[in-house]
Amino acid sequence: MCADWEAKHGLKKVVTVVSDFAPGHDSETYFKQTFTRAGGEVPLSLRVPLLNPDFAPFLQRVRDASPDGLFVFIPAGQAATMMRQFVERGLDKSGIRLIGAGDITDDDLLNQMGDVALGLETAYFYSAAHPSAKNKAFVEGVKQANNGMRANFFGVSGYDGMHLIYEGIRKTGGKTDGDSFIGAVKGMSWESPRGPMSIDPETRDVISNIYMRKVERVNGELWNIEFATVENVKDPVKAAKK
């Protein structure tokens, strides 16, 4: 969704930098396919070691390519280092917009990243700042039960998984065999802290909203603030392979 959105809102030439492991490869492939299909150009794709303390050589290659955007998919702990070096090398002042997959700005780790994360745009299925009453209650519950922890995508995924199991077994009358359970949850829908959720009756994949988010400071803390919604999204990687 990040690729679609950015292609429609000004970005024409984007370099990708991803961690060199399977999820990074998938993210790179999906972004390139979607962005180029929308008319954009990806002149350079870089893969960095999964545990990489120095992004300077890669960022220099990014600068040399003169893109108007940099898409990153790097685990949150490493992402903070990359973003700091992005700012230290002045790329934030060079006209290169930093964008990425949502888990690089993990809600629970976001404040540790500091101001280098400000302005980063991401696309993801959850933000702790989602304004629904259900999410506000969820965020407060997680905070109270976990010594101040902020709810994140791991937490909401666990919540939805438990909800699905509970409702599935309730619908089967206690039967837990595979056929009964799968039959019960096909097409199921519910209101999650992340927003509306459902199970595709054909593929049994999750269908949910994807939110465009921007890191902003609110009341002294950093949050992924939603500014646009793409509703009822199916698995984007599978869709890109069709």
What does each model-found stretch correspond to?
Residues M1-K242:
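Extracytosolic ligand-binding ectodomains
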